[in-house]
């Protein structure tokens, strides 16, 4: 008898747990992706190059696999294409959400209409598509929403094209960028929700909803929404957690999700829970495939694959506990976490990479995932969640230890930039694009105070910048502030690190150096030193 197969959509890093779990469960892992060089292709038992949005091509291939390879189910995680899964899966009679429900959970205006119809808490919104996207329509909608509001592509993930609109001056260009990032040239404008944000994963199975992950999301850098990490499980108050779970369950019901994975990005606002979005799949961002398994001991991807293959997810059914949420739509359960897992990202200022230092994996660090950033490649301060430079994941019995270890590992990562690059110079100048006031932020808010200090003159070549700072009491006070930059170093640690890395630095203009450090952190400090050396060598 032919070994059973599952068809997995996507061959990137986020799909690696699915490919490995399928093989561990005894399935042939058949994988499709538009990119034959995707980083997890080598793990597949069989690979075919298919664009994940080509639903009819996926269906035809699935039909072939059903006839020839004993196909049992279709699956994805961490992609935009749960609708492609359901389109083929529904036609072939596999266990999955309906195609209509998957579309509801993919196309944001449809999602909002479902929530509206069922009184599910979510922000007020307007949507425009194609020729409807005019400056007049956009400005009228923005005026009705008031500031700040948010624009998103209707059908994209990873926060690509998503940003806050803080004034009329930012509105029209922001919407045009969002439209470019939409596969259907559709955008949604909505109220901004103020409050802490959370991610929830769940399995919908036989009329029950089982929570399989509830994490704190750490979102920064307005006007964009950059997730610098998440921590599993959340530290939220239990009463608030149950309210959020109940609202999530109402949203799952409103979308019509009945069989498979569901994930939510949700906030707790002054109005209570407000749903950002719900997807018909497991989460990406290292949550379902890494941090939840580390914290709970459950291979969630394997359990979701079992559901997709028409089998019982015994690994969650056996250990789940009932939750008393008062929800009328589902019997709700929870698979709680025993440990804490923290994921944190490291990021870069704009420039061109000269060299990379990747942090080592030392307990309790479980994984270090550098993004495909290469020497000679360009980097930028992220405007979406695809532009970060790498991630670390930890596991500990303590929330504080898991977070501390993740931050320490990130602080050890370093991208040295090529000297004398215009993008880096523009950033270090403290200037901003017209519609991005305040972005990218400075490494330290004290950057604005440096200009007013009387610190003219030169730091002698090879002289410790920390010792030099001792001669300037006001500068020393700024260095001793506890504020940390985006890679979890404070200003004092940054100066110490500079002294360690650049003991033979050239003579440095004192004001320019300290402005560069407070604006660009360690990268900025070393960049300005390297640029001085480069200029001297050219002379």
For each feature predicted by the language model, list its residue ranges.
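Short, well-ordered beta-strand elements within core beta-sheets of diverse protein domains
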Residues: 163, 191, 293, 388-396
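Glycine-rich active-site loop/lid that clamps phosphate-bearing ligands
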Residues: 345-375
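Short, flexible turn/loop "capping" segments at secondary-structure junctions
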Residues: 40-41, 151-156, 223-225, 284, ...
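ATP-binding N-terminal substructure of ATP-dependent carboxylate-amine bond-forming enzymes
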Residues: 1-101, 131-133, 312, 324-334, ...
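Short beta-strand-to-loop capping motifs
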Residues: 166-167, 202, 346-349, 392-398
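Active-site nucleotide/adenylate-binding loops and adjacent lid/helix of ATP-dependent enzymes
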Residues: 107-188, 194, 206, 231-246, ...
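Active-site "cap" helix and flanking loop/linker of ATP-utilizing ligase/carboxylase catalytic domains
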Residues: 243-264, 279-354
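Phosphate-binding core of ATP-grasp and ATP-grasp-like enzymes
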Residues: 178-186, 191-233, 242-275, 279-288, ...
